[in-house]
Amino acid sequence: METKKNNSEYIPEFDKSFRHPRYWGAWLGVAAMAGIALTPPKFRDPILARLGRFAGRLGKSSRRRALINLSLCFPERSEAEREAIVDEMFATAPQAMAMMAELAIRGPEKIQPRVDWQGLEIIEEMRRNNEKVIFLVPHGWAVDIPAMLMASQGQKMAAMFHNQGNPVFDYVWNTVRRRFGGRLHARNDGIKPFIQSVRQGYWGYYLPDQDHGPEHSEFVDFFATYKATLPAIGRLMKVCRARVVPLFPIYDGKTHRLTIQVRPPMDDLLEADDHTIARRMNEEVEIFVGPRPEQYTWILKLLKTRKPGEIQPYKRKDLYPIK
């Protein structure tokens, strides 16, 4: 359950209904993840990788969406290569989640030695100059960790979120996100609360890759295909008077390290039109994700909206039919 605060911020709040037996399975899962998070990564990561790959074989619908996305985005890759990317994606997912849980339970001082920042000087300069910032963050599996780390260092952070289907998972997940402070804004409340936070000096966290439908989106290139991309970041940077900084986390299950890549601010968007803004957003996703595609959440319906006359790829029966 979520409780509204100050008409804009959402704070997860425990509800007595969470004690009901129907949620015991969820609590068992939470306890298991907490136990895993306290296990040294050199032991847990190989186990989580195997479990993730196994789960990826069972989750046929999620696997199908990922394969469809990859077939359209990387047609030059063989079927075996795309299958391998999906396997590694499912291996990476629980490893990144375990690191997030470890950060929440043990604190940043325990994981900082395993975190490498590339482009940290960009962030430090903006902090020195007291600039407003919106991070453009492709939807990777470790997406929440950089914001939590910055919050743990005293930087005020604000992000938008979708509620989880299970209320216990929703409560725990958002409690973890807020472990070191910051603000969460529900997407169904619109963009205004997020804008207000950025204007007040909170550094924003914006995920650019959700499909918002055709009405306000631009059809622009996305890897080897195209995508309906909402060019909202251009308006946000003007309304918030903020600089847009691309950022992407990469978790390596072999070295047990997290690399956070930070790229130069996208100041070129200030005078750009919507089509150019949308393409630049996708370009930043490509730069980050292209070399490490297993880090990206390919299970999302990224390519749902198509041009008139085209069938949504996830509804095409000829693409990876589930057997």
From Swiss-Prot:
The keyword Membrane applies. Pfam families: Lip_A_acyltrans. The chain crosses the membrane at residues 23-43. One of its GO terms (cellular component) is membrane. One of its GO terms (biological process) is Kdo2-lipid A biosynthetic process. Its EC number is 2.3.1.243. It is a single-pass membrane protein. Pathway: Glycolipid biosynthesis; KDO(2)-lipid A biosynthesis; KDO(2)-lipid A from CMP-3-deoxy-D-manno-octulosonate and lipid IV(A): step 4/4; Bacterial outer membrane biogenesis; lipopolysaccharide biosynthesis. It catalyses: alpha-Kdo-(2->4)-alpha-Kdo-(2->6)-(dodecanoyl)-lipid IVA (E. coli) + tetradecanoyl-[ACP] = alpha-Kdo-(2->4)-alpha-Kdo-(2->6)-lipid A (E. coli) + holo-[ACP]; (9Z)-hexadecenoyl-(Kdo)2-lipid IVA (E. coli) + tetradecanoyl-[ACP] = ((9Z)-hexadecenoyl-tetradecanoyl)-(Kdo)2-lipid A + holo-[ACP]. Keywords: Acyltransferase, Cell inner membrane, Cell membrane, Lipopolysaccharide biosynthesis, Membrane, Transferase, Transmembrane, Transmembrane helix. InterPro entries: LipA_acyltrans, Lipid_A_MsbB. A motif (HXXXXD motif) lies at residues 139-144. The keyword Cell division does not apply. Catalyzes the transfer of myristate from myristoyl-[acyl-carrier-protein] (ACP) to Kdo(2)-(lauroyl)-lipid IV(A) to form Kdo(2)-lipid A. Can probably also catalyze the transfer of myristate to Kdo(2)-(palmitoleoyl)-lipid IV(A) to form the cold-adapted Kdo(2)-lipid A. In vitro, can acylate Kdo(2)-lipid IV(A), but acylation of (KDO)2-(lauroyl)-lipid IV(A) is about 100 times faster. In vitro, can use lauroyl-ACP but displays a slight kinetic preference for myristoyl-ACP. PANTHER family: LIPID A BIOSYNTHESIS LAUROYL ACYLTRANSFERASE, LIPID A BIOSYNTHESIS MYRISTOYLTRANSFERASE. HAMAP family: Lipid_A_LpxM. This is Lipid A biosynthesis myristoyltransferase. It comes from Escherichia coli (strain K12). The gene is lpxM.
